[in-house]
Amino acid sequence: MIYQSPTIEVELLEDNIAHLCFKAQGSVNKFDRETIDSLNAALDSIKQDSSIKALMLSSAKDAFVVGADITEFLGLFAEEDTVLQSWLEQANVVFNKLEDLPFPTISAINGFALGAGCETILATDFRIADTTARIGLPETKLGIIPGFGGTVRLPRVIGADNALEWITSGKDQRPEAALKVGAIDAVVAPEQLKPAALKMLKDALIEKLDWQTRRAKKQAPLTLPKLEAMMSFATAKGMVFKVAGKHYPAPMAVISVIEQAAQLDRAGALQVEHQAFIKLAKTEVAQALIGIFLNDQLVKGKAKKAGKLAKKVNSAAVLGAGIMGGGIAYQSASKGTPIVMKDIAQPALDLGLGEAAKLLTAQVKRGRSTPAKMAAVLNNITPALDYAPVKDADVVVEAVVEHPKVKSMVLAEVEQHVSEDAIITSNTSTISINLLAKSLKKPERFCGMHFFNPVHKMPLVEVIRGENSSDETVASVVAYASKMGKTPIVVNDCPGFFVNRVLFPYFAGFSGLLADGADFAAIDKVMEKQFGWPMGPAYLLDVVGLDTGHHAQAVMAEGFPDRMGKTGKDAIDVMFEAERFGQKNSKGFYQYSVDRRGKPKKDLDPTSYELLQAEFGEQKAFESDEIIARTMIPMIIETVRCLEEGIIASPAEADMGLVYGLGFPPFRGGVFRYLDTMGVANFVALADKYAHLGGLYQVTDTMRELAANNGSYYQQA
């Protein structure tokens, strides 16, 4: 053994080829400070052994190296610039040391080689991957850029255009795509990976392969004609800004870094990368996006933990077909859990199966599936007009019409047809789980399972714990949601649960602005372009359906009359009474037509303005800051109330619920990250300015206390 540490081992193989193996004690290899130090020491040991003629890197895990240890980032990024600069320089000394070894080197890549893992393989002369490999630099998704030479080496290996596409998108690449652009040299079956890597090294040793020219190219300026470079970078800036927009600076920074470093050697190019990395690491966007990543890991960790307590789900059933039932059936079947889709009407079953088939056909068209896989998924969905096929289901998802009496009747009915230990859930957005539980003989096996529409696109599932729900029931539903490819968060029962409870105060703030004469289109523009929501409140209500919104608003008003009760008509009432239900009947706040691609197209409609003006009087203009304050303050305070009341367990889960369930702007990180960034004291002062607008604008005593102590929510957590 040449070198050994808890994360890396180096041994000598035949023909004096050294083998450096990443073998962390956890489930995956990642570059924390300890691993970087170990790699440095391992490379020193290799350099000191004059018998070594070549080096192969590999992994003992299912993935090569998944990236840097992101849990270290927030603390590290809070340090002074000089500390960050020193960290980057020290790490890059190690990667340069790997690249500068006096003999050929190769990476044998299996599974993920992302971020720092990708930067590791770029530092070797050759790269060979097996068919499981996924390679990429996802740092822009965290609001930063690669920091260990990724922006320097990748353009010199695969060309500037390809590198810009890889790094700005942050997507990982399949081995075939990586081979096509020259990021790797060969793709082999997993069992052939190490033999093929050793063969390449031996060919390099007898000069069949020129490793020295390859290495020199990586360390030299980019060979890009000046005019071509200007055109290439200018085009990239336009295309990337169109996708990333002004709220996400990292993708644009990538272009600037590669452009500035194009005519520099390795040392100069790395300095450009370091400076840009440090600047981005200090941004609120990076803090927010890294926070989301860490929150996502926390939620997934909880789901994994729940799996240990969960009842195994081998088969499922959904009651109620149609679009929602079809979406749930598709999601379950496509992730490997067979499901019965039961309805009382054949047309509804046809619609549900049609929805699943439509989603699968789209996957095939995009090349993400095959006709054979599509057929297998459809075979996993069993349509039924009676309960006979439901009897063996481990989990039942009731997804009938949103009406308490209908749901209660169906729940009581299905309980008679399933096994004693089958879990029963209700997909409801507004109806109390405790109320529905009364229809069951065994309420301990019941909880809520709230999917968001469209099911195949929305990552969140709210798992709602009723007062009688057992821990096993909740854990089993969390595990099932996770198996379906969803992100489950557990919330306690209350009107609106978590997501809708915090959404409707936002709509109330919007309605208040309209009552005071604001233009709904102007509000949408501010909330989309400035705050960063994917849809403004008027557009969102049209998509959700103003009939649905009207019903949910009434539920919220009944549940929280002091804050959400109404004394007169609001804009939602006006649209509902005029039977303007949104996209579903082509008229809401906006009017809708179908474009050439069959997608809904929205336009302004004079009728909407006439209806609102008749109820609320003449329009007047509002400043952007006031629009943002009056819509967001109620949502933020209600989110805090949910945490204080134990409806949601942590700031992390609340923020994930908002980002995944509502599309809260990721670059803001969620309500609690937004509050911490703004400063709780600053928020309290802002809310007090609008306190005269009513209970939704009244901050809690705990918020005032936290503000007085200069505290923050994530610091507490």
Curated annotation (Swiss-Prot):
Top-level taxon of origin: Bacteria
Gene3D superfamilies given in the database record: 1.10.1040.50, 2-enoyl-CoA Hydratase, Chain A, domain 1, NAD(P)-binding Rossmann-like Domain
Region (Enoyl-CoA hydratase/isomerase): 1-189
Site feature location: Important for catalytic activity: 119, 139
Keywords annotated in UniProt: Fatty acid metabolism, Isomerase, Lipid degradation, Lipid metabolism, Lyase, Multifunctional enzyme, NAD, Oxidoreductase
Quaternary organization: Heterotetramer of two alpha chains (FadB) and two beta chains (FadA).
Family: In the N-terminal section; belongs to the enoyl-CoA hydratase/isomerase family.
Function in brief: Involved in the aerobic and anaerobic degradation of long-chain fatty acids via beta-oxidation cycle. Catalyzes the formation of 3-oxoacyl-CoA from enoyl-CoA via L-3-hydroxyacyl-CoA. It can also use D-3-hydroxyacyl-CoA and cis-3-enoyl-CoA as substrate.
Identification of the protein by name: Fatty acid oxidation complex subunit alpha
Organism: Shewanella pealeana (strain ATCC 700345 / ANG-SQ1)
Gene that specifies this protein: fadB
